[in-house]
Amino acid sequence: MSHVVVKNDPELDQQLANLDLNSEKQSGGASTASKGRYIPPHLRNREASKGFHDKDSSGWSCSKDKDAYSSFGSRDSRGKSGYFSERGSGSRGRFDDRGRSDYDGIGNRDRPGFGRFERSGHSRWCDKSDEDDWSKPLPPSERLEQELFSGGNTGINFEKYDDIPVEATGSNCPPHIENFSDIDMGEIIMGNIELTRYTRPTPVQKHAIPIIKGKRDLMACAQTGSGKTAAFLLPILSQIYTDGPGEALKAVKENGRYGRRKQYPISLVLAPTRELAVQIYEEARKFSYRSRVRPCVVYGGADIGQQIRDLERGCHLLVATPGRLVDMMERGKIGLDFCKYLVLDEADRMLDMGFEPQIRRIVEQDTMPPKGVRHTMMFSATFPKEIQMLARDFLDEYIFLAVGRVGSTSENITQKVVWVEDLDKRSFLLDLLGATGRDSLTLVFVETKKGADSLEDFLYHEGYACTSIHGDRSQRDREEALHQFRSGKSPILVATAVAARGLDISNVRHVINFDLPSDIEEYVHRIGRTGRVGNLGLATSFFNEKNMNITKDLLDLLVEAKQEVPSWLENMAYEHHYKGGSRGRSKRFSGGFGARDYRQSSGSSSSGFGASRGSSSRSGGSGYGNSRGFGGGGYGGFYNSDGYGGNYNSQGVDWWGN
């Protein structure tokens, strides 16, 4: 092998210098384009290679003059991913709650739960929203508008609300409004009110909105279906839009610097059930459309991991059940340090379900601002004495608002009570369903979970499209059942009491108490699922010997609501009263305390607002045993009854008087 000495050749030296990765200055500054870059063999000695390693030309450049990448997947100077949008993920993989598209600046589709938030984990908080005007609406989204506002009905009987009496007690009560335009709630709220097709406020909204806008605490007692949810959401969101995020935004930013993802909601709404929490959340989505406010909902029975991921995208208004909220707080995911607005919806129901320890833990034993600093509202259809005493601890110089017949039922609901033995209930139910038509939404209440499954199976084999919900069903199954019912695919829903409170299912035409509850207040909430927000409705209850304990209360309720009272029920109530059966009467009818502000009672036994009427003047008759008068004692002869059953006859008028 021969060794040949090669003379120094300038071109060869240049190539060797280019192969030296550790020498950025080999070319003596004459060829700054190379900067020690390796040149692929197919580009060596070509003129086209001169611009290939230009530091300004492409992503191959690794110049230290830039502290962030500029290509797909790059990082900007603030350490945030260029691929991940700084605005956070959207709602349900379509558009987010404020109308932004799923596509970020580089055309990448947003995938829920796929990290489309910055490293600190709270996208909507950590943008430049502190510099933005929260009162200005964001751009509209036609697709999101269709999703949020496509349904709804204000009701054909809305005018009747003008005559409902209202009683407000408390110092310096703000004057009520007659129209939404009478009070300044901002451009965003007024636009969303128009989209929801609300023409004018209901009585509870007329009084509650100016009270909350005036930053006064409130305890409101209104009939079910009267628009309580909008009564507190509208003024709370209006105030948030006006005031902005305040200190909560800084707290989230500061917290995020250390890798934590704790959220500090500005408003908290507590609800007793998962269904009611989801319903309030959906309403909050409507009224926060085109705003920078992001509502969230957390409840038990669902994947907590998914709920945490949703929270980490930002949370300004939180709707929660008490148990799941305590869990989130103990995990360090929720802080209430900057909560300005607290709402307890269906407060009596939460106490009935045993949530008082959790509520006090949330309100009194954590970091929530004390009363007088935060603004607190309590809403429910009934307010017994225990709830009003709880208000002393949570509310500061509050206003008590009683709308209509407190704890009573709406006159928009036609109530029918029929005597049906247990063995005849299924046959009578089939007759009712046949009379009301297969397209009408019908809600059937039973007392037990087993009874719900059994009745659903019976109706299915009779050819009826039906579904059911109760406490043993998974959250997913319950939500699917409610969706099938709302959409009309399964127009018959069999339910236990889990669905009785707070559910806002539009256009329920008929509520049937297949099994009457033992508590008259539960009866009030059950039949309140129909006749909502001015719509007309019908409630039919099957009564027999097992329901003797609510005879007197049921009679008083029918009289209050100006309903037709069967003569046999009057006779039963009279006899039951004089046998001492009134000992089991509910708190609602024990002097009517839940109907008025306890601060005004001063120990008096006054019956108060909407108190029950006595029945001492009822006819003694011949005793209820011989006065059922339904032909054969069962449902068979009931069609010819003068007082009630005539509307069942297919040859006469229907249930609705047509």
UniProtKB/Swiss-Prot annotation:
Q: Which residues form the Helicase C-terminal domain?
A: 412-573
Q: Which SUPFAM superfamilies match?
A: P-loop containing nucleoside triphosphate hydrolases
Q: Which SMART domains match?
A: DEXDc, HELICc
**Residues annotated with Omega-N-methylarginine modification:** 100, 109, 588, 613, 628
Basic and acidic residues bias locations? 1-10, 44-68, 93-128
What does the record give as the reaction this protein catalyses?
Answer: ATP + H2O = ADP + phosphate + H(+)
Chief subcellular location: cytoplasm
Family as reported in the entry's similarity comment: Belongs to the DEAD box helicase family. DDX3/DED1 subfamily.
Q: What does this protein do?
A: Probable ATP-dependent RNA helicase. May play a role in spermatogenesis.
Descriptive protein name:
ATP-dependent RNA helicase DDX3Y
Q: Which organism is it from?
A: Pongo abelii (Sumatran orangutan)
Q: Which gene encodes it?
A: DDX3Y
